[in-house]
Each structure stands twice: as structure tokens, then as C-alpha cells.
Amino acid sequence: MLSRVLTVFMLSLGFLLPTSEAQQVTRIPRVGFVAPQGRSLPLFDAFRQGLANLGYVDGQNILIEPRFAEGHYERFPGIFAQLVGLKVDVLAVTGAVTARAAKKAVSDIPLVFSVVVDPVRDNVVANLRQPDGNLTGVTCFDPRQATKQLKLLREIIPSLRRVAVLGDQGVSEALMNASEEQARALDLQPQRLRVAGPNPDLQAAFAAMRQQHADALLVLEEPVLGVHAKEVSELAAKDRLPTLFAPS
């Protein structure tokens, strides 16, 4: 799924930037990249490599200006103000929370979003076929993903019955609903848990898992959980709870 998202993402950006052959001006186009996580985010390296594969090499014929909120969503207004001040030519943003903040802060710079499960229900765009104003992007929603993840958990734990599903309260419930539906289809008992950012109460979430005797944990590919993946991993290890993270 990630490769498919990146392919469309890079192609979208490619249409917005001049090709190296057509670029005769001395000014090098600037591309802003904004994510809610930290610099260790694998998607940024894939983003930069994807642009290079299309002929847009950072430091040669484009300049990439990466910014990472590191889980502090209150930083978004300042981040976008800074990038507007740098006169970036296009903004690439990941996640619904980031896309909403970009939409609010920027009106005259092309915005390309990715890793948004449901752009309409997440209040990123009003219409998928005709996105608002300066917005375009791709959805990462694939209902089959939950089935594959749950089947993998069952292979690891043949006795699997109760699976906790941890999601982000700040985005739509599309991925959570699909995961619950697929769990029931596999005769599993899902436990819905949603935490709110930027400082989620993960201790309470894990206490609820212990109370319900969860056999395993499925962590959804949603913003606040990507930011706090290390803390989730540590709590799961402490409880000796088998955990599967979606790629991020």
C-alpha cells in the first residue's frame, strides 16, 4: 500500500514542478514536507528517494524543506508560517491532522496530502473527485489491510480470540470500523480503543486491554500512534502483549 501511495504522491508533485529540461531560471524550486512525527519517519526518506527517481534531486534541481512536529500539533501554525515565508512552491503533508492544519494555514500554495484514510470524513476535502482549492492527494484506505494483519496475528498466535485495536481519536473511524468488521469475520472479538493526541493516555488504554484479557494488539496506521510508537512498544513489551504495527 505504501508504495502505491508514494507513486501517486510523487507523480502529483511531478506535475506541479518544472522538469530539469524546462527549468531555465536560476531559482531552484522549494518543496515543503510536513509530518506529525519525528525525523526518523521512514516515509520522508521514501519521499525524497521517490522524487529523485522522478528526476528531482534534493540540493540539485529542488530544495526540500522538511519539518516535523514530533507529536506537538500546536507547532503546525508556526511550521506552515515559516514555510510560507520561505516561499515554497508546493507543500507535501502526511496525515489528516497535518492536512487540516495546512488547509487552514495556506491558501495560495499547492498542497499534496498522503496517508489520509478518509479525506472527506477527516474534513480534508469536501469531494474526492473535485478537491477544494489548492488541495490534491491520495487516500491510503484499503479494507483488505486489516484482514491480512489479523490473519498474520492468528498465524503467530493460533489460540487468538480477543484482539485489541488501538486507533487515533483525531481521525475518522474508517480504519477502525474496517478492522472491527474483519475481526468479527474471522471469528475474533475486537476491543475498540481510541486515544486522543497530542498526549494520548496510553496507560489507560493498556489498562483496559489487561482488564479485557486481550490476546494481541493491532495498532492502526494513524497519526498519534505513529508519533508514540516507541511508548506503545514499551508498554506492550511490559505486558508481554504480542503487537502488530501497520507500516508508517
Provide a role label for each language-model segment.
Residues 1-248:
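Short hydrophobic alpha-helices and adjacent helix-cap/hinge residues
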